[in-house]
Every structure is written in structure tokens, then in C-alpha cells.
Regions:
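Conserved N-terminal glycine-rich FAD pyrophosphate-binding loop of Rossmann-like flavoproteins
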Residues: 36-57
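Beta1/beta-strand and adjacent pyrophosphate-binding region of the FAD-binding site
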Residues: 2-15
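A conserved beta-strand/loop capping segment in the N-terminal third of enzymes
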Residues: 52-105
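Predominantly flavin-linked oxidoreductase catalytic cores and closely associated redox partners
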Residues: 107-225
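Conserved Rossmann-like nucleotide-cofactor binding loop
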Residues: 15, 38, 158
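Glycine-rich FAD pyrophosphate-binding loop
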Residues: 12, 24-43
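Small-residue (primarily alanine) positions within well-ordered alpha-helices
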Residues: 12-15, 19-20, 24, 108, ...
Length: 225
């Protein structure tokens, strides 16, 4: 008989990791499934304000960011058409997504959740008391099935795990901008730590921040033309 889980969560980013932590702390039997291997790099989402820290604190992880080496952020530096302004960012922190996401998952595992990586999940038919999910291991190619009373999909906009008739339809506006990001090895002091640096223009913007390991996270959004 297939194993029955209380909650199966697809996607191990911050939403999935936090959901797994919450559910595991409630004593539920939790499986967290992620198609990539972790830790993995990701640019956006490495800056944390008071609200983000309050959420972590409410889950018993008040020092998670600092324990992982997170660096304080105290200012936002803006540049537009040759002019510059600096705004205060009280109690901000920066921590790479490699460190943060993995730490959140580790907390969920410590609370009792089970995590599986490099595994694709496909939600199948629903029964009165559970939902069936097909899992495929990327390394072995082996396919298996599990059942869960609740399935949470936290796989982002690019998810392909729901049946077509349940997935909804994403609409991309013609005027929407393209996003791009990378991690840069930079040993100059032009972009000091402790600040978010942003350049703004009519056709888009670029922002960067120095991480706890000295690398720069750089991301931008640009008009299509």
C-alpha cells in the first residue's frame, strides 16, 4: 500500500521550506519534494526586512539569518540620470539564497519533515481522503507514488506539476519586462557591503548587493525593446 502523508509540499524555496517547518512543528507527517539539488544559487530574495525577520522569529528561528553569517543592511542607494539618493534601511539583512533556503530546510528536517531532492512531482487524481502524487527520481529514473491528505504546490510560476485542467493559465502582459540575474566575483570596494545599490532608467532598472561571502548578487528588469 502506498505511504500516506499528512502534507506533501512541492518546491523547497522559502515558501515550501517555511510551510514544511510549520507543518512539521504541528506534528504532521510532512514530505518536501524539490526537483533541483540543494544548495542552489538564486539571486532574488536575498534581502530581508523587519517583516521577514518577524516571520522567522514567530517560527522559533529568530537568529537563523545571523547564524548563517547574514550581513546587516542599513541603506538603499538609488541612482537616476546622474543623481543619487541614499535612504535608511533599519534592521535589514542580506544572506545568499544558497545559505538561507538550505537553513530553512534544515530547520524543517530537524522538526521532523522528510526532504527529497532531484525528484520531480506530478499531482494525479484525487480521492475522497487523499491526493495521489507521482514521483520520479532524476538520478535513478525510478518512478514511485505517494498519497497525501494535503498537497501544497510552492513550485513557482514555472511549475508543471498540476494537471492541466487545474493549473490555471498564466497571462504575460506584452509590456512586461524581462528579468535577469547573476552572481559576480568582485573584489573592488566600489560597491560596499551594507547597502543595496540600484540604477534606475526609463527602460528598466538594475540592482546589486554584496552577500555574506563577498560576492555580488546582481539582478535587473528591462523593457523588451
Amino acid at each position: 500500500m502506498d505511504m500516506l502523508w499528512d502534507v506533501l509540499i512541492i518546491g523547497a524555496g522559502p515558501a515550501g521550506g517555511l510551510a514544511a517547518l510549520d507543518c512539521a512543528k504541528q506534528g504532521l507527517r510532512v514530505m518536501l519534494v524539490e526537483q533541483r539539488s540543494f544548495p542552489r544559487w538564486k539571486v532574488c530574495g536575498c534581502c530581508f526586512n523587519n517583516q521577514a525577520q518577524a516571520i522567522l522569529s514567530s517560527r522559533g528561528n529568530a537568529t537563523l539569518i545571523e547564524d548563517c553569517g547574514g550581513q546587516r543592511l542599513d541603506s538603499l542607494r538609488l541612482g537616476l540620470r546622474g543623481r543619487e539618493a541614499s535612504l535608511a534601511l533599519p534592521n535589514g539583512f542580506v544572506l545568499s539564497r544558497e545559505q538561507f533556503d538550505q537553513a530553512l530546510i534544515n530547520s524543517a528536517i530537524k522538526a521532523g519533515a522528510s526532504a527529497r531532492f532531484q525528484m520531480t512531482a506530478q499531482v494525479e487524481e484525487a480521492s475522497p481522503n487523499y491526493r495521489r502524487v507521482r514521483l520520479k527520481d532524476h538520478q535513478s529514473g525510478i518512478t514511485s507514488h505517494v498519497n497525501a491528505r494535503i498537497v501544497l504546490v510552492a513550485a513557482g510560476l514555472s511549475q508543471r506539476c498540476l494537471p492541466q485542467n487545474e493549473a490555471g493559465q498564466s497571462k504575460i502582459r506584452r509590456q512586461s519586462r524581462h528579468g535577469a540575474g547573476c552572481v559576480v566575483d568582485d573584489d573592488t570596494d566600489h560597491y560596499p557591503s551594507g547597502a543595496i545599490h540600484m540604477a534606475i532608467g526609463n527602460q528598466g532598472y538594475v540592482g546589486l548587493v554584496r552577500r555574506e561571502d563577498g560576492l555580488l548578487n546582481l539582478a535587473g528588469a528591462f523593457d523588451r525593446d
